[in-house]
């Protein structure tokens, strides 16, 4: 029974397939197209006609006209036929049908299929008239404007649903401008809404223009909101590039960046693989990019909530007059105090804003006009100072109607907070704390604690402090701040601080203060002469200097050697003279023979001079012979025409006693000698007429003789003397007894 029922069922099904054929009614085929029913010009298109098995031929029609006929292969029966079109154009656009034949009968036509070819006209424009971000279930208004007057407009949505809206335009016949407003909705968060607009002529509805730019409507969903941040920061100078990061769910497929108030999506990024971060570029930044931004992401689960708002500020828009930012006399301030920063400009702005470089602090104030200076300014009071206030600051100007468009930045001002490192630092000055203008000074800051950077600050200077990396020497960290050619402006009180690289603006406690005093310049006469030597000649100069030094030392050595040798020779000569003198004294003492002088050759033409000279020799001879006075003589050098010179007279003993004439002093003898040298006349007659007087003798000891020639006076006849007289000036050693009443 069961078998019979199964056999009858199979027979019924088989008959069901062939009953339409037997009755002359073939099943209607189904027509499809690949890749899409809307394609651009030049695309390859394939039509597929699906029919029943056993069809002998298949037919394809466009606008009721046969386009293709394809016979079926009985060896390989199939239930579909493909019609291929290469490089389609606007002539291929239209309404298509297909049919087939089987057992000598034709089937009905398939349902119509429109093939739309785009790119025949210029593209229209499409924009959102309301915020392109809506909540789920909301509506949006899109405006489409054709590029050709009178064209019908069509709005399409990308996706499997193939939604579209057609509408004739509203045209202004005077301006020939046409547009259509499409009110679309409700929009759900379970799909993407990407719209495009086309235009076409009424008589050729399948030949469209090129598509407009896409407009995607973001539907705020319920997925977790992403985070948003900007690099290098949300305040950026015009013309530079920036990156906006949006981080969301791991299943995110695409990210969107939207600027509030804009009718278009600012930027999108489709991820090749699902991920939780997107990198959205804006380059170069212009003033049109200023504003508030949010980002979204879409995944298979729908849309996310919007991120927090990111305010993007574009600077450098107004650059007529630079802004100035000034602060306390020293940028180094203690923790807990208050600091006032002044932002000034010659140009009017509605507001000034003070911002920290890391953008963790900002404050804006209305500007005030200062009539005395002709400037606009704002005073920013910060305090009490904490580590959060340390860093670099700038101020900008802007107007209320464009709060995200700022001026050029002011100068950079650094604020350093002290007392953050409990290190002990020391500061010393070399060569001295008091120097002359133009000299070089070195301030050394050091500590036994680990310090990455030393900071040298001058009280009240208003200048940024000096920074130097520390160096380890002698088991201590130190830095040397060298100042060459100092002036009086560098006089003042200095302190040094230390910091770590991880927190450059957080400083240690200050070192003990050091006062530097720079006095007036050194006088030029006190300075040694200097010479500027070019760097390329320094090597030659050093070689020449070494050569001169060696030559000088060699010359000095030779000079010392000659002096020592000469001194040695003088010593031996003196010893020889002393020995010779001793021998002569011994000979003169031992012989005791009278000393006679041959005076025959010293005849004078002047009788007075001759008489005086004879008296002198006679006195000396008489002293030797009568009184027992010993006489020592030295022979003059050979060739001396003056003969012997009496050098020393030494009394042995006194033979007489009686009246002694006064001793003749050395001055009197010298006076007589000088008168003789000057050639003064001697009154010989007065000498001859006077009575003979006693001659006074003095014991003399002379080591050196001075010889002079005296020109005697002319004789009465006017004749010159025959030869000059020679006299010897004797130095008196000590007084002694002399003979009395010795006549000349």
UniProtKB/Swiss-Prot annotation:
Gene3D superfamilies: Immunoglobulins (2.60.40.10). This is Leukocyte immunoglobulin-like receptor subfamily B member 3B. Glycans are attached at residues 79, 338, 440. It is a single-pass membrane protein. It comes from Rattus norvegicus (Rat). It is found in: Cell membrane. May act as receptor for class I MHC antigens. Becomes activated upon coligation of LILRB3 and immune receptors, such as FCGR2B and the B-cell receptor. Down-regulates antigen-induced B-cell activation by recruiting phosphatases to its immunoreceptor tyrosine-based inhibitor motifs (ITIM). The chain crosses the membrane at residues 544-564. Contains 3 copies of a cytoplasmic motif that is referred to as the immunoreceptor tyrosine-based inhibitor motif (ITIM). This motif is involved in modulation of cellular responses. The phosphorylated ITIM motif can bind the SH2 domain of several SH2-containing phosphatases, including PTPN6/SHP-1, resulting in the dephosphorylation of the downstream protein kinases SYK and BTK. Residues 26-119, 121-221, 223-316, 320-419, 426-520 form the Ig-like C2-type domain.
């Amino acid at each position: 029974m069961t078998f019979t029922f199964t056999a009858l069922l199979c027979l019924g099904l088989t008959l069901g397939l062939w009953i339409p054929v037997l009755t002359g009614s073939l099943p209607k085929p189904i027509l499809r197209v690949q890749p899409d029913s809307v394609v651009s010009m030049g695309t390859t298109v394939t039509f597929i006609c699906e029919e029943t098995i056993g069809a002998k031929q298949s037919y394809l029609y466009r606008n009721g006209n046969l386009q293709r006929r394809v016979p079926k292969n009985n060896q390989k029966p199939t239930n579909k036929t493909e019609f291929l079109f290469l490089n389609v154009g606007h002539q291929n656009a239209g309404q298509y049908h297909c049919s087939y034949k089987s057992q000598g009968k034709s089937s009905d036509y398939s349902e119509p299929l429109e093939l739309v070819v785009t790119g025949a006209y210029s593209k229209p424009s499409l924009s959102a008239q309301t915020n392109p971000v809506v909540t789920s279930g909301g509506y949006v208004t899109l405006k489409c404007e054709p590029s050709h007057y009178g064209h019908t407009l069509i709005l399409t949505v990308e996706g499997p649903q193939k939604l579209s809206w057609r509408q004739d335009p509203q045209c202004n016949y005077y301006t020939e401008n046409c547009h259509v407003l499409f009110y679309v909705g409700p929009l759900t968060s379970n799909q993407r809404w990407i719209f495009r607009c086309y235009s076409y002529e009424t008589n050729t509805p399948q030949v469209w223009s090129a598509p407009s730019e896409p407009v995607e409507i973001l539907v705020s969903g319920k997925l977790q909101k992403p985070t948003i941040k900007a690099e290098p920061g949300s305040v950026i100078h015009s013309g530079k590039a920036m990156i906006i990061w949006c981080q969301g769910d791991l299943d995110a497929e695409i990210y969107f960046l939207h600027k509030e108030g804009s009718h278009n999506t600012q930027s999108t990024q489709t991820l090749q693989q699902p991920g939780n971060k997107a990198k959205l570029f804006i380059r170069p930044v212009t003033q049109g990019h200023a504003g508030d931004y949010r980002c979204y992401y879409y995944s298979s689960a729908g849309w996310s909530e919007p991120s927090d708002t990111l305010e993007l500020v574009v600077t450098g828009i107004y650059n007529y007059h630079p802004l100035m930012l000034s602060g306390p006399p020293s940028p180094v301030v203690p923790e807990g105090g208050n600091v006032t920063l002044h932002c000034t400009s010659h140009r009017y702005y509605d507001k000034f804003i003070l911002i920290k470089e890391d953008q963790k602090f900002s404050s804006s104030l209305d500007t005030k006009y200062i009539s005395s200076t002709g400037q606009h300014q704002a005073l920013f009071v910060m305090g009490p100072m904490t580590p959060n206030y340390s860093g670099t600051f700038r101020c900008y100007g802007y107007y209320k109607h464009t709060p995200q468009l700022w001026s050029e930045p002011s100068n950079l001002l650094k604020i350093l907070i002290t007392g953050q490192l409990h290190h002990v630092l020391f500061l010393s000055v070399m060569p001295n704390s008091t120097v002359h203008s133009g000299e070089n000074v070195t301030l050394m800051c050091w500590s036994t604690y680990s310090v990455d950077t030393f900071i040298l600050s001058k009280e009240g200077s208003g200048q940024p402090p000096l920074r130097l990396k520390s160096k380890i020497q002698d088991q201590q960290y130190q830095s040397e701040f060298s100042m060459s050619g100092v002036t009086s402006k560098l006089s003042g009180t200095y302190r040094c601080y230390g910091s770590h690289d991880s927190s450059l603006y957080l400083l240690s406690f200050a070192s003990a203060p050091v006062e530097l005093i720079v006095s007036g310049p050194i006088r030029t006469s006190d300075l040694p002469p200097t010479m500027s030597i070019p760097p390329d000649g320094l090597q030659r100069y050093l070689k020449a200097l070494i050569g001169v030094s060696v030559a000088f030392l060699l010359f000095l050595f030779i000079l010392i050697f000659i002096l020592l040798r000469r001194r040695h020779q003088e010593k031996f000569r003196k010893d020889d003279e002393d020995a010779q003198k001793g021998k002569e004294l011994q000979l003169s003492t031992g012989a005791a023979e009278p000393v006679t002088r041959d005076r025959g050759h010293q005849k004078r033409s002047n009788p007075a001079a001759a008489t005086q000279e004879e008296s002198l020799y006679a006195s000396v001879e008489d002293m030797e012979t009568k009184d027992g006075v010993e006489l020592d003589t030295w022979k003059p050098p050979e060739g001396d025409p003056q003969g012997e010179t009496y050098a020393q007279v030494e009394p042995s003993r006194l033979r007489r006693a009686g009246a002694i004439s006064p001793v003749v002093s050395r001055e009197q003898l010298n006076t007589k000698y000088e008168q003789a040298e000057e050639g003064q006349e001697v009154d010989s007659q007065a000498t001859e007429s006077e009575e003979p007087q006693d001659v006074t003798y003095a014991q003399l000891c002379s080591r050196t003789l001075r010889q002079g020639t005296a020109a005697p006076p002319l004789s009465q006849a006017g004749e010159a003397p025959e030869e000059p007289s020679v006299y010897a000036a004797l130095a008196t050693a000590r007084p002694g007894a002399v003979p009395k009443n010795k006549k000349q």
